[in-house]
């Protein structure tokens, strides 16, 4: 109780507030329920207030138990036997049963889950690290926190559409201090499907739709495992280009499959997994990118990822193994001409392995208690090729030697940092201000001084600077003489973005928005083929692209349809027009239109 005092809602000198008093009773009640006092409730405490004891308009408060406190609320309870009742996906009542250790399981027709999985979680309170505590009954004290952990963990498995845990006294005697647990659950349908659609258009650039479709098979091996297969595709065509080439000049398609386990598969954590829930995901994928008249890029690979969520607000994702192989195919004469003029572009696209490790930390307090204006922060660090280079070093080769190979193919070596911060200010129920800042840096070294094209940064599009399409600006103040080549080499190794958006309710689920977007990408190293592209402090401010616009959203809570109209205010390159507003051309020519699903940030 004393250790939890720092979380108190009441502090000396603060303004008297009835809401805070109720929150304090709830906090203390939760502390007691986490220590076995199952029947204790906030209403079993009351305040005594006195304004005469403390002068100066202050109130002396004393929190005391209510008179006639029930005897059941004054003693701790222990967890006893457990029973499970599993209903069919259409609500069919159990018609069979089995005993697993001391767990009685009732099910319909066929048991669709492994008994040991249910046993582990319903006996969660027995799994503690301290051997002395395990030897005593203290390990079986009822805990509201552990009840919520068990219920949340089992719900997240995707096995059940309904789940409820009920605790009841073992018998009706006055001295009974044991609670038996009954779990009731209804199986969910084994398959989930997901469809995503996206359309981007701009009157003087690229336009086209994209889509992805995924199917997930839940509870593959009876322990909450899920298997996902996802197909994705998109294509773009040139509008207003004045060329008589094929309308469809770019497309991308791919397929991926992943298998997720609701625990750490390797190494085995044993009892610690109950205090530190985690998942393990194995993923394989293959993507084909076609840039018509230029090249095709085939990428395939796989990774293993551990996800940990030790608290409600923090999440860690560790990828100790991630291997990608890029293959450049079907190079056209036009592309070779561009590559000859820009060797860095060709090097970033050529055949290469990307052996990487990755760590991501995410902080999201939107679901935390008492948070009105939530923040979201995510940072990712990626290291590629370093472990492979260490192995080469062990065999006598220099760590910094270039053109080292893996299976006779060069491999990339770089360090990449990406961080993004978001804040949502809820002014009232009809007005909100959302903001975002994003930074990224990519530094290639050792085996290759040019980072892979697929790892480089770009800006523009429906979720970035909405006055510009994807890869239509940057790096820095560079602007290709041939606009049709722009999306090939308008990437960079340093990224900065800042956005602010005012959202206002128009009518019920219809929201309007006005926004201001800024940002660009730059190169960390000088590139003679792309002048004015290097990151420099003196040119940084004027090379930040700026755009504004308005939008409309249909917010159904679980799904948001969004239509944004963006217009540039400042271009990061020289347009031969003086002043900060250096945009040329008509309003309609520069208007960017984006239709998307979900908020941009």
Sequence positions of predicted segments:
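Interaction-mediating elements
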Residues: 1-156, 161-168, 178, 269
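Membrane-embedded beta-strand positions of outer-membrane beta-barrel proteins
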Residues: 195, 227-231, 282-284, 377-381, ...
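C-terminal outer-membrane beta-barrel translocator/porin domains of Gram-negative envelope proteins
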Residues: 98-108, 198-205, 317-504, 514-538
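Flexible, small/polar- and glycine-enriched "cap/hinge" segments at structural transition points
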Residues: 519, 524, 549, 553, ...
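Hydrophobic alpha-helical transmembrane segments and adjacent short intramembrane/lumenal linkers
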Residues: 493, 508-510, 543
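C-terminal soluble interaction/assembly domains
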Residues: 129, 137-140, 535, 548, ...
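Gram-negative/organellar outer-membrane beta-barrel architecture
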Residues: 2-5, 11-14, 21, 41, ...
């Amino acid at each position: 109780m004393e250790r939890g005092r720092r979380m108190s809602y009441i502090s000396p000198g603060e303004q008297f507030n009835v809401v805070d008093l109720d929150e304090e009773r709830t906090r203390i009640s939760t502390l007691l329920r986490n220590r076995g006092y199952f029947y204790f409730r906030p209403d079993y405490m009351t305040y005594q207030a006195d304004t005469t004891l403390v002068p100066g308009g202050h109130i002396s408060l004393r929190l005391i138990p209510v008179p006639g406190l029930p005897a059941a609320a004054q003693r701790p309870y222990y967890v006893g036997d457990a029973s499970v009742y599993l209903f069919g996906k259409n609500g069919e009542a159990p018609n069979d049963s089995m005993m697993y250790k001391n767990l009685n399981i009732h099910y319909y027709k066929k048991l669709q889950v492994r008994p040991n999985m249910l046993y582990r979680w319903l006996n969660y309170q027995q799994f503690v690290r301290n051997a002395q505590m395990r030897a005593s009954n203290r390990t079986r004290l009822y805990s509201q926190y552990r009840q919520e952990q068990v219920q949340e963990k089992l719900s997240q498995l995707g096995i059940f559409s309904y789940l409820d845990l009920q605790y009841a006294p073992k018998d009706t005697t006055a001295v009974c201090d044991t609670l038996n647990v009954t779990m009731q659950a209804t199986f969910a349908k084994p398959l989930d499907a997901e469809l995503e659609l996206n359309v981007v258009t701009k009157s003087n650039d690229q336009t086209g739709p994209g889509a992805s479709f995924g199917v997930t098979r839940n509870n593959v091996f009876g322990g909450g495992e899920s298997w996902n297969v996802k197909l994705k595709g998109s294509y773009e065509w040139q509008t207003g280009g004045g060329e008589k080439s094929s309308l469809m000049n770019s497309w991308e398609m791919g397929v991926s499959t992943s298998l997720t386990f609701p625990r750490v598969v390797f190494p085995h954590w044993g009892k610690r997994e109950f205090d530190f829930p985690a998942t393990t995901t194995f993923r394989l994928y293959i993507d084909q990118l076609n840039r018509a008249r230029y090249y095709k890029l085939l990428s395939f690979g796989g990774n293993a990822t551990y996800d940990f969520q030790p608290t409600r607000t923090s999440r860690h994702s560790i990828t100790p193994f991630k291997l990608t192989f890029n293959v450049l195919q079907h190079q056209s004469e036009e592309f070779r001409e561009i590559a000859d003029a820009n060797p860095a572009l060709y090097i970033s696209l050529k055949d290469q392995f990307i052996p990487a490790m990755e760590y991501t930390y995410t902080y999201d307090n939107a679901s935390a208690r008492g948070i009105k204006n939530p923040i979201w922060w995510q940072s990712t660090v990626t290291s590629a090729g370093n472990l492979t280079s260490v192995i080469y070093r062990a065999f006598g080769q220099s760590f910094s030697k270039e053109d080292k190979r893996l299976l006779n193919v060069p491999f990339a070596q770089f360090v990449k940092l990406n961080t993004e911060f978001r804040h949502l200010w809820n002014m009232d129920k009809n007005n909100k201000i959302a903001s975002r800042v994003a930074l990224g840096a990519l530094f290639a070294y050792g085996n290759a001084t040019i980072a892979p094209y697929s790892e480089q940064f770009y800006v523009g599009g429906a979720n970035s600077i909405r006055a510009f399409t994807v890869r239509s600006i940057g790096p820095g103040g560079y602007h290709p003489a041939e606009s049709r080549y722009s999306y090939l080499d308008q990437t960079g190794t340093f990224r900065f973005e800042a956005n602010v958006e005012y959202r206002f309710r128009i009518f019920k689920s219809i929201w309007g928005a006005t926004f201001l977007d800024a940002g660009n990408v730059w190169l960390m190293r000088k590139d003679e083929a792309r002048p004015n592209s290097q990151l420099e402090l003196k040119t940084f401010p004027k090379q930040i692209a700026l755009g504004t616009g308005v939008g409309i959203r249909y917010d159904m809570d679980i799904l948001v349809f969004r239509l944004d109209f963006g217009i540039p205010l400042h271009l990061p390159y020289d347009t031969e027009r003086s002043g900060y507003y250096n945009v040329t051309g008509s309003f309609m020519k520069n208007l960017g239109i984006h239709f998307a699903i979900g908020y941009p940030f």
